[in-house]
Amino acid sequence: MIEFYGKKLNTYRANLHTHSTTSDGKYTPDEVMKLYSDEGYDVMCITDHRKTNRIADIDPHGMLLISGVELHPAGGRISRSHLLCVNVPEDFVTEEMAAQPVPGENHMQEIVDAVNAAGGLCFFAHPYWCGFRSEEVAALHGLAGIEVYNTSTRYIGRAYNMQLWDELCDMGLRFPALAVDDVHRAHDLFGGWSVICCEERTPECVLAALRAGSFYSTQGPQFKRLSFENGIFEAEFTPVTTAICVSNQCRGYCAAAPNKDGDGKTPEVTSLRFDVRNLFAASKAVINCDYLRCQLRDAQGRYAWSNPIFIPEEYRG
């Protein structure tokens, strides 16, 4: 349970980027579902490369299973794009979508449009790993968001996408961000997930929450409360060593700092309270859109991220 901006909502642990033997994963769909069920997950989306799975044939092991696919249309400068397509029909993938991308062509917007037309959500997967710049991602219209963390790409140092996320928010794009495993092998399991905040675990509620950004993403730390009222942002969470309010202003707020006494003890914090007007007190810059997100880090180095809120004009100084 979480108090999410004035509403008490249930929380559901989700992995929305999953591969199986249908494409290049080690585990069969049933095997990967059991692994996540045994770990306490509530929602799964199997997103094999260029192929959907027949959901009715897969044992969900008590979880909500959503149909999905990962597609790779041409359009990148360095590599093809990776688009995470959530809640698409089993017959969604056409021959053109499944074909190898042709260098010099760009079909990314076509895929995003097709996903939206089918009632799905299209997230840009691991943009840093793919070598995409923020302006290239921003050029796509209709994206549901991006991945802020991707477990499987951590081995080459490109697992985190915080800077690109902030650049997109600075452009005024209201992008929530997922943490995912992108599981292919055992070493990809359980490294990052999204916590969906909604009334019940039904496809309708879960998908509506994803569309609205009613979730947070994490590698371990948990948010217990998020609030923004009268210009005051508040958060409560499990113990962490650092809690930061991040914005597109040079000013921010840190609710914990390294131990200055040098006694070997690690300070911890479980809440923060911040008046967003302090962001603008010393700034004279003209900024198109101002936002705030909360970022936690615990003693094990694991992050959690709230989705950005956009600050009304009345609180900007």
Where are these regions (language model features)?
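A metal-dependent hydrolase metal-coordination microenvironment
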Residues: 2-121, 125, 132-135, 139-142, ...
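C-terminal functional module detector
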Residues: 1-7, 11, 171-176, 181-317
